[in-house]
Amino acid sequence: MLRSLRRRGLYLRLIGLVVLLAAMYIAFMTNKYYLLFITNLVFFAAIVLAWNIIGGYAGQLDLGTTGYMGVGAIVSSILSNNIGLHPLISIILGGLSSALLAGAIGFPMFRFGVREVWYALSTAAIVVILNNAVRLLIGPYEYYLRVRPIKTYDELYLATSIALVLVFLLNHAVNNSRLGYYLKAIREDELAAEAIGVDTRRYKLLALMIYAFIVGSLGYLYVVMIGYFYTYRFFDTGISVSIAILGIIGGLGSIEGCLVSAFLLRGVGEYLRTSLAHIIPGLHLLLYGAVLITLGVVEPEGIPGIARRFTTLLKTTKRPVGGVK
């Protein structure tokens, strides 16, 4: 009974997501600028959902997103362009390379008990190290990677939408699996999880590698979107921090909350950038930061907390005066 209800709920959420993606495409398909704009939103929604696995379920504040995405982008682009592998195979291998890198990094950190703020600082430092390593290999300027299997913005939107749906389904699979239960136990109280027999190192490492595989695979799409490989964009701690912020405001472990946060807040940020950046440089960042701070102060639990408040308000307004039915 419970399983059938969960399955029905998943189907309804999946249909809702597909309808939303289709409606966005129909609304903006005639305007290439706005089509690329919503493609960017869909892409970052997939990235935020990937972060939700390590940050939302496992409770690890990971700031290395762009590092794994950049490594996956380089590997998949070179395999596709220079060696001639099929783009899909290249994407998978790029994701695997990021997952292996995450495993090599995460194993010693979890083995020696690196956690909380020290884990966040370590992952941010990894992005800086990777940035400088790549600059030594390909130079300090933009590097053109000739990857254009996707010829139109319509195809690019379709590809990013498929990626988002797949990451959405993977989140649900993790959430309702034994892995998800263990990760949430680790998030709530790691010492208590260890006390009841959960191998916290193993499951945190597994969550890290799954997350790195997803963002590494998505790195190829990011190269296709912008056309160039910019080291300062692919290995940017600022983008990693913004993704973590979107995941936190979306609610740790909340799939729908992360989607709302990514679409809404990322959309607001991009709108402010395109509207105000030419007026006063940096004004859009100031306003965007003010929006994030306000959300954090008003509702520390993020989007789920706002949804609960709104639901409670609706129930209160429907109740007759004096509580008499």
Question: Residue locations for each model-derived region?
Answer:
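Cytosolic-side transmembrane-helix boundaries in multi-pass membrane proteins
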Residues: 1-21, 137, 188-190, 194-202, ...
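Membrane-interfacial amphipathic/re-entrant helices at transmembrane-helix boundaries
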Residues: 1-46, 75, 83-90, 323-325
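Transmembrane alpha-helical segments in multi-pass inner-membrane proteins
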Residues: 208-293, 298
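Extracellular/periplasmic helix-loop junction at the C-terminal end of a transmembrane helix
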Residues: 124-159, 180, 300-306
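Loop-to-helix entry region at the N-terminal start of transmembrane alpha-helices
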Residues: 35-39, 147-169, 285-289
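Helix-loop-helix "hairpin" substructures at the membrane interface of multi-pass membrane proteins
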Residues: 153-230
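Single transmembrane alpha-helix segments in multi-pass membrane proteins
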Residues: 31-83, 104, 108-118, 190-194, ...
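Alpha-helical transmembrane segments within multi-pass membrane transporters and channels
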Residues: 83-126, 260-264
